[in-house]
Amino acid sequence: EDTRPRVVALLYLMLLIGMIGSALIFAALLKDFGYVRLIQVIQSAAVVTLLLNVVAMFKQEVRRPDLTAHALARPTFGSAWRDFITLPQARRLLWALGLGTMGFTMQDILLEPYGAQVLGLSVSGTTMLTAIFAGGMVLALLIIARSLAKGTDPILIASIGVLFGVAAFSLVCLSALVDSSSLFQLGVVLIGFGHGLFAVGMLTAAMMFGGKKMAGLTLGAWGAVQATASGIAVFSGGAIRDLVSSWGEVGLLGMAMRSPAAGYL
């Protein structure tokens, strides 16, 4: 119980170190951009990803015959889920996780093309956005680890993250109006910061929810909701951008919206 906040923070920190490292490598490799170079980088990344995952999964979870014996009584998934979903605040926790994840994830496929199409950033410059985003999350982790260790409510931390996200997306929208890549990059940093607060806060809340009996099911539900919300957000973000852009191009939204930024905003 005492080390749980540090475990969650360490989990995300290692994830972000990988994101920052890969983003810097991609930015360097794509500095002299070409389609052949892009194909080579993608192929190499696929091979490296496969090898790293094999190494990472090797002997990750030891066998526990005392917990996996067939003679042990196991509740059905249906009964376990009914016990979980009837817990106080369970539905609210999952809804908050899903909506918050969608709000932050819809930017995933939009920030890089936004920087390139609206602000004229290079391929290397847009690739660096991943490192900038991850840097904001690392900054959030440094604050979260200390706050959670002092007993701060993880839901409060997640709520503060949402507020930072609202402010950050406002800066991203404003950057197009003033044509400022610096303001855009500041918005990306704050998006990462807010996302870090929200994601770690919600994961910590899920780990604390339901006690030891429901720990596995709670984390499974957390992962399922997050993955589903992320998939819906990525699809809807791209679809909304394309739809609004097409309306703007034909003048359905007025002359003010006939710009490359219309679909993103």
Predicted features by range, described:
Residues 163-179:
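C-terminal ends and interior cores of transmembrane alpha-helices
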Residues 63-94:
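Juxtamembrane intracellular "pre-TM" segments in multi-pass secondary transporters
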Residues 30, 139-156:
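Helix-to-loop junctions at the C-terminal end of transmembrane segments
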Residues 1, 197-211:
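Intracellular juxtamembrane helix-capping segments at the cytosolic ends
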Residues 46-65:
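C-terminal membrane-cytosol helix-exit motif in multi-pass small-molecule transporters
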Residues 109-126:
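Short amphipathic helix-loop junctions that connect adjacent transmembrane helices
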Residues 5-30, 223-237:
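Glycine-rich segments within core transmembrane alpha-helices of 12-TM secondary carriers
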Residues 28-47, 239-265:
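A membrane-interface helix-boundary motif in multi-pass transporters
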